[in-house]
């Protein structure tokens, strides 16, 4: 199934946490004939389509047609996490008769965008069972939480909004008598005894469904409004690209790989973030399973290439002065190649040419993004993955507005173009003299 705007909406609405992103992708892969491998097991020595999951991260690859130990990798990397409000370990508060859940910001969350929204809960419970500990996904898609804003009549300054993340972003979830704890309530909703919950990784999500909005052209809406476009739009586009390569280009001279990592929004320095050994260890095991050696693996990295797929800033119509004037970026105008002289993005001349060629072969336009020199620039998994693996890397994305808001906006037509470019990158060869 090709990537579509409707498909992205369904993907996002089913995936409110990094754990759910991995579960959604895993479900699609299993349906397409992929087999899940556990890292602790011995991996099969025959070609095939496989994936492995480490907490909120996943790596998938199609080596069905590529048994030779020197076939290079073509990798699409993205991240599964998004800035949000997360539940503290001891969240229960009682303030002026209100039952309050203590929250804290995760990543560079745009705090004010979370006020006065109906919020659900998602994440993972670690539960004691008969054999030890098991992990259960949690999804409560009911409006159980809300972070209420202060009335304008009570504000110290009506012209600006300053939020203290310790005091001002806690959520209410009821009044009056309540015996159970918040985690106990979540456990009950998940069908688990509260006494068996050993740990909880819980986070909030906006309950407004993803939607196609804006003026329609030939019956098709031009814009897509959704939470977590940064960076679930890239996870979805990369997943569909990998599955399309399976159908169209399995005899390619590359092993196509999808690597989606948790914790990008907080620096990637975790046991399953982009700074971990997850990608490099999986790639080495692919080579070893094909009968190769570590020497073969190291040689293979030099001919491989990685596209770090993360969303890009479209030029904002209300704040055009916040953008580089010679590099306007539009929605519905094709994927974005991102370049930064101080390596906030990993793109160099060789990898930029590879992605430009991929866009040409996919028949989609490509835009080039440069950040204003007088503003600090964010980064991606690109420089981190490149440093960890030594694989030449290009940073790319799709254009959007309102990055890190609870609700973001992109071009509906960019979904298919973005995935098509990534598909071409996974399968198209770059000839070099």
From Swiss-Prot:
Alphabetical list of NCBIfam families matching this protein: PRK02813.1
GO biological processes: proteolysis
Swiss-Prot/TrEMBL keywords: Aminopeptidase, Hydrolase, Metal-binding, Metalloprotease, Protease, Zinc
Protein name (database record): Probable M18 family aminopeptidase 2
Organism: Mycobacterium tuberculosis (strain ATCC 25618 / H37Rv)
Reported cofactor(s): Zn(2+)
Keyword Zinc assigned: yes
EC annotation from Swiss-Prot or TrEMBL: 3.4.11.-
Presence of the UniProt keyword Hydrolase in the record: yes
Record GO cellular component, one term: cytosol
InterPro entries (UniProt xref): M18_aminopeptidase_2 (IPR022984), Peptidase_M18 (IPR001948), Peptidase_M18_dom2 (IPR023358)
HAMAP family: Aminopeptidase_M18_2
GO molecular function, one term: metallopeptidase activity
Family: Belongs to the peptidase M18 family.
First-tier enzyme category under EC: hydrolase
Binding residues for Zn(2+): 79, 153, 404
